[in-house]
């Protein structure tokens, strides 16, 4: 286990949806801000890694469990910990607590290092991960098996300039926007995710069009994001009905 790091914050108005809950893509953005602050304090910021090694962190998988979503103006604590790493993968935990210390969201993220020029995965550099004091463990954490969709409902979206980050690829949280949007407003008004497994397969090209496809059976949905004939991301979501206050 590695060093833990925490930050408190209140959910701002622009991060709340029609139900008054924080949008899950914003949960990811806030969580990555917290891990970024930890990296800065440990002397291994994204800027330093890029300048010294020409490497950037990318995320390949998320495993997210939701008890409930924080609401507008609610104060939360986001805690993160770099758990372990092996030759290629680094595993990080994010946990979101309410003011009473109750766990609201638990998220596991799998990171890899990528060479910014070649766009190829790079082996973990020991000096980059050493400050986090996480364990070296050869064991791979594997997600579920993602199957192709047989009869999906789909919708196309244009990839906009501001969907891209400074690495030149679509921001991680944007994929969740596309995944949720295809579910429709009526469904999203009554249901929130209970568990999400999300796998990033291939970068989306700037300026193109993606197709977000879904197959839903009861409270489980299977998702696929494709562009130019290739699969970019896959997800499996279990949903839960929104509890009335």
Regions from the language model: what does each represent?
Residues 1-79, 83-245:
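Terminal targeting signals and extreme-terminal segments of soluble enzymes
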């Amino acid at each position: 286990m590695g060093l833990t790091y925490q930050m408190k914050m209140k959910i701002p108005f622009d991060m709340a949806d029609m139900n008054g809950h924080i949008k899950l893509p914003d949960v990811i953005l806030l969580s990555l801000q917290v891990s970024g602050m930890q990296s800065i304090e440990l002397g291994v910021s994204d800027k330093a890694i890029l300048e010294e090694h020409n490497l950037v962190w990318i995320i390949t998988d998320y495993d997210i469990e939701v008890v409930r979503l924080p609401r507008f103006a609610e104060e939360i604590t986001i805690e993160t910990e770099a758990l372990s790493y092996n030759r290629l993968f680094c595993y990080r935990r994010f946990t979101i607590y309410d003011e009473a210390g109750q766990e609201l969201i638990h998220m596991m993220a799998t990171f890899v290092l990528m060479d910014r020029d070649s766009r190829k995965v790079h082996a973990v550099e020991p000096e980059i991960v050493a400050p986090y004091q996480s364990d070296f463990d050869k064991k791979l954490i594997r997600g579920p098996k993602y199957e192709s969709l047989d009869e999906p409902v789909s919708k196309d979206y244009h990839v906009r300039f501001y969907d891209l980050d400074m690495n030149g690829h679509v921001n991680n949280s944007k994929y969740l926007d596309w995944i949720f949007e295809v579910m429709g407003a009526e469904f999203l008004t009554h249901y929130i995710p209970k568990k999400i497994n999300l796998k990033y397969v291939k970068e989306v090209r700037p300026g193109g069009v993606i197709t977000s496809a879904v197959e839903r059976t009861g409270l489980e949905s299977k998702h696929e994001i494709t562009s130019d004939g290739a699969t970019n991301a896959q997800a499996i979501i279990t949903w839960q009905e929104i509890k009335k206050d």
